[in-house]
Amino acid sequence: MAEFTTLARPYAKAAFIAARDASDLGGWSKALATAAAVSQVDRVKTVLSAPGLTAQQKADAFVALCGEELAEKQQNFIHVLADNRRLALLPEISVLFDLYKANQEKSLDVTVETAFEIDAATEKKLVEALSKKLDREVTLSTAVDKALLGGALIRAGDTVIDGSVRGRLAKLAEAMNV
């Protein structure tokens, strides 16, 4: 997985730069998400791995499957990926592109897991506090996990803040085993 991310990074960056320069981050994000979904269909994977087809034929077939979702520059991007045998990287390219897009827009998706349902007022306070701390516009999603026992587990990008009772007990158990 890390290898795929490393290979996908320059393509995601190139797509991001093209989208930013065209002021079309949303359109590119949608197109890449569609292409990533199409690339994960088993029959499509079979066609893309067929040794008898040229890169041009694979790209043309892939673009045809995506239909009207891809603009001309996005179709050209698919052809570049096919020429370099990188169509299988589309899911990683899409994820990385969305990370670049979120960074550009100064937004961040945050997931908060709690042992109990949190009310709207608490959710609003949490969004305000996280927005201020992270200097980003925060989009919050919540989940209930009774195994946490209490407290909260916050995931913001690659940052994890474990303020749960389960996390504290795990740290205590680890300290006692030392």
UniProtKB/Swiss-Prot annotation:
Q: What does this protein do?
A: F(1)F(0) ATP synthase produces ATP from ADP in the presence of a proton or sodium gradient. F-type ATPases consist of two structural domains, F(1) containing the extramembraneous catalytic core and F(0) containing the membrane proton channel, linked together by a central stalk and a peripheral stalk. During catalysis, ATP synthesis in the catalytic domain of F(1) is coupled via a rotary mechanism of the central stalk subunits to proton translocation. This protein is part of the stalk that links CF(0) to CF(1). It either transmits conformational changes from CF(0) to CF(1) or is implicated in proton conduction.
- Subcellular location(s) of the protein: Cell inner membrane
Task: State how it assembles.
Answer: F-type ATPases have 2 components, F(1) - the catalytic core - and F(0) - the membrane proton channel. F(1) has five subunits: alpha(3), beta(3), gamma(1), delta(1), epsilon(1). F(0) has three main subunits: a(1), b(2) and c(10-14). The alpha and beta chains form an alternating ring which encloses part of the gamma chain. F(1) is attached to F(0) by a central stalk formed by the gamma and epsilon chains, while a peripheral stalk is formed by the delta and b chains.
Q: How does it sit in the membrane?
A: Peripheral membrane protein
* Disulfide bond positions: none
Q: Which N-terminal residues, if any, form the signal peptide? A: none
| Assigned protein family | Belongs to the ATPase delta chain family.
Give the source's domain of life in one word. Answer: Bacteria
Membrane-spanning segments: none
Which PANTHER family does the record associate with it?
ATP SYNTHASE DELTA CHAIN
- Which Gene Ontology cellular-component terms appear in the entry? plasma membrane; proton-transporting ATP synthase complex
Main subcellular localisation: membrane
Q: Which organism is it from?
A: Saccharophagus degradans (strain 2-40 / ATCC 43961 / DSM 17024)
What keywords were assigned to this record?
A: ATP synthesis, Cell inner membrane, Cell membrane, CF(1), Hydrogen ion transport, Ion transport, Membrane, Transport
Name under which the protein is recorded? ATP synthase subunit delta
